[in-house]
């Protein structure tokens, strides 16, 4: 019987070798993704979002990285797999759309060759169908005149066209999971919308699971089913998109949402989250990492110990108890939300 979950990650930690010793970049991550679900992972730069994605893809250097825990992809364990054993999974069961297609694509290979290479690694399609499959993929992602594009190099295409090629490569072998790592960051607004619509169209057609890594909360509200918030390598909150936007609990989640401008913003000054994400050498995972960054909560931060994620309501998980103590300064003065 086919499992409902395409991805199950349990107690996943990733550590990088830095100056001769391993330092954890992400710690104790538990996540699952159902077929047909869109999971958005949000957080500032340095929160560990892409590190988690590359762990799922098996893209870390095993000599410089330690990965512990369990990552089941379609019920198959991927932690510990390297070389050909991981290559057989990457591209067939999971495909990844990278942030910058200009650096992700090979500048010395024509577009058609790059898609053919992805098909040749796996046995999903026979060799005599490669050419027709390449044209089919390029048409599917909305590229006009595929016969011309297959003979072009990446630099000859626009940014939007290159990202469409990246999507074609990612879905070439019909993976059950698509990871989109900031797929629209380098594109203008109108092209961003087209690319997001394309990803969702493919997801619905194939009933694939999608992990969308982004810092754009507007995009999250529009396309996600579930949201996972990461901070300094930890998952701090996870809930349905409706629940998270209407009833955020963790101080970091609330700060992210408050700093996001909207049409309803009436204050002259936008809220700015104080400080910055700590470096790997500064992280103490037994402390509440975000409270230590907030000036008016530093004293409280010393008393709050970081705890595991707990379910505070149906499918709404929050790390620790800090959310019960956190208030914005103006809330203390006015006794309520601004």
From Swiss-Prot:
Database matches in InterPro entries: AAA+_ATPase, ABC_Ni/Peptide_Import, ABC_transporter-like_ATP-bd, ABC_transporter-like_CS, Oligopep_ABC_C, P-loop_NTPase
GO molecular function, a single term: ATP hydrolysis activity
GO cellular component: plasma membrane
Keywords associated with the record: ATP-binding, Cell membrane, Membrane, Nucleotide-binding, Peptide transport, Plasmid, Protein transport, Translocase, Transport
Domain ABC transporter stretches: 7-257
Single biological process term from Gene Ontology: protein transport
Main location: membrane
Entry's EC annotation: 7.4.2.6
Lipid bilayer topology: Peripheral membrane protein
Catalytic activity: a [peptide](out) + ATP + H2O = a [peptide](in) + ADP + phosphate + H(+)
PROSITE patterns in UniProt: ABC_TRANSPORTER_1, ABC_TRANSPORTER_2
A Pfam family it matches: ABC_tran
Localization in the cell: Cell membrane
Domain of life: Bacteria
Keyword rRNA processing among UniProt keywords: no
List of residues binding ATP: 43-50
Keyword Membrane (UniProt): yes
Family annotation (SMART domains): AAA
Function: Part of the ABC transporter complex OppABCDF involved in the uptake of oligopeptides. Probably responsible for energy coupling to the transport system. Essential for uptake of peptides larger than three amino acids and for growth in milk.
Protein family: Belongs to the ABC transporter superfamily.
Subunit structure: The complex is composed of two ATP-binding proteins (OppD and OppF), two transmembrane proteins (OppB and OppC) and a solute-binding protein (OppA).
Name of the molecule in the record: Oligopeptide transport ATP-binding protein OppD
Organism classification: Bacteria, Bacillati, Bacillota, Bacilli, Lactobacillales
């Amino acid at each position: 019987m086919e499992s409902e979950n395409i991805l199950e990650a349990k107690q996943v930690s990733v550590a990088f070798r830095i100056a001769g010793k391993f330092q954890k970049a992400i710690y104790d991550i538990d996540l699952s993704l159902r077929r047909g679900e869109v999971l958005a992972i949000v957080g500032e730069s340095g929160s560990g979002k892409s590190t988690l994605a590359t762990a799922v893809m098996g893209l870390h250097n095993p000599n410089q990285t330690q990965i512990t825990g369990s990552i089941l992809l379609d019920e198959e364990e991927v932690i510990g797999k390297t070389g050909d054993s991981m290559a057989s999974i990457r591209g067939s069961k999971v495909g990844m759309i990278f942030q910058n297609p200009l650096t992700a694509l090979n500048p010395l290979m024509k577009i058609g060759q790059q898609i053919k290479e992805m098909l040749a690694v796996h046995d999903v399609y026979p060799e005599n169908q490669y050419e027709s499959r390449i044209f089919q993929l390029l048409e599917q992602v909305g590229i006009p005149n595929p016969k011309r594009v297959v003979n072009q190099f990446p630099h000859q295409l626009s940014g939007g066209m290159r990202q469409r090629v990246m999507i074609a490569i990612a879905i070439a072998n019909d993976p059950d999971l698509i990871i989109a790592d900031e797929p629209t960051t380098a594109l203008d607004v109108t092209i961003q919308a087209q690319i997001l619509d394309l990803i969702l169209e493919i997801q619905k057609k194939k009933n694939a699971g999608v992990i969308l890594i982004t810092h754009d909360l507007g995009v999250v509200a529009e396309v996600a089913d579930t949201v996972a918030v990461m901070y300094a390598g930890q998952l701090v909150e996870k809930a349905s998109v409706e629940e998270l936007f209407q009833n955020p609990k963790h101080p970091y989640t609330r700060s992210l949402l408050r700093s996001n401008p909207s049409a309803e913003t009436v204050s002259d000054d936008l809220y700015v989250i104080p400080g910055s994400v700590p470096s790997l050498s500064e992280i103490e995972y037994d402390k509440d990492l975000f409270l230590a960054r907030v000036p008016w909560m530093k004293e409280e931060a010393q008393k709050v110990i970081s705890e595991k994620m707990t379910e505070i309501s149906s499918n709404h998980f929050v790390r620790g108890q800090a959310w019960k103590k956190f208030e914005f300064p103006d809330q203390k003065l006015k006794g309520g939300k601004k």
